[in-house]
Amino acid sequence: MLQQTLCLIKPDATQRNLIGKIISYLENAGLKIKAIKKLQLTQAQAEKFYLEHQDKPFFASLVGFMISAPIVAIVLEGENAIAHYRELMGATNPEQREAGTIRALYAISNQENSVHGSDSETSAKREIDYFFSKEEIC
């Protein structure tokens, strides 16, 4: 099934000039870029985007990290794009990351793990709509 999903290249990766490497990795894996933008999140934007985590102990540090440097938001498209991209990302936990995944290659820690990806069709729609208008996706 053809799907779209959201990829965020996080501040740790943008600060280390990994944007091009991550985009190449995604395209080489067969995903198409339908929209892309680089932006600096405000605290309010980061808090709203991660609202589902507001009661978790890591919320404040996550928001602080996400506003620490620019991010890149990307709409990816492909067959079963949500699951495919999540496989390419690799596990959040460093000890569970499979070799060759984006996080195995570039992550520094659980939080500084280079990329974010939607975990379901519902979250993909919400997250894509958060960053992109319909006119920006082509």
UniProtKB/Swiss-Prot annotation:
Binding annotation for ATP: 10, 58, 86, 92, 103, 113
Keyword hit for Magnesium: yes
Keyword Cell cycle attributed: no
Catalytic residues in the record: 116
Catalytic activity: a 2'-deoxyribonucleoside 5'-diphosphate + ATP = a 2'-deoxyribonucleoside 5'-triphosphate + ADP; a ribonucleoside 5'-diphosphate + ATP = a ribonucleoside 5'-triphosphate + ADP
Cofactor: Mg(2+)
EC number per UniProt: 2.7.4.6
Localization per record: Cytoplasm
SMART domains listed in its UniProt record: NDK
MF-aspect GO terms: ATP binding; metal ion binding; nucleoside diphosphate kinase activity
GO BP of this protein: CTP biosynthetic process; GTP biosynthetic process; UTP biosynthetic process
Keywords carried by this UniProt record: ATP-binding, Cytoplasm, Kinase, Magnesium, Metal-binding, Nucleotide metabolism, Nucleotide-binding, Phosphoprotein, Transferase
Gene3D superfamilies from the UniProt entry: Nucleoside diphosphate kinase-like domain
Cellular component per GO, a single term: cytoplasm
Superkingdom of the organism of origin: Bacteria
Function: Major role in the synthesis of nucleoside triphosphates other than ATP. The ATP gamma phosphate is transferred to the NDP beta phosphate via a ping-pong mechanism, using a phosphorylated active-site intermediate.
Subunit structure: Homotetramer.
Family to which this protein belongs: Belongs to the NDK family.
Protein name in the entry: Nucleoside diphosphate kinase
Lineage: Bacteria, Pseudomonadati, Pseudomonadota, Gammaproteobacteria, Pasteurellales
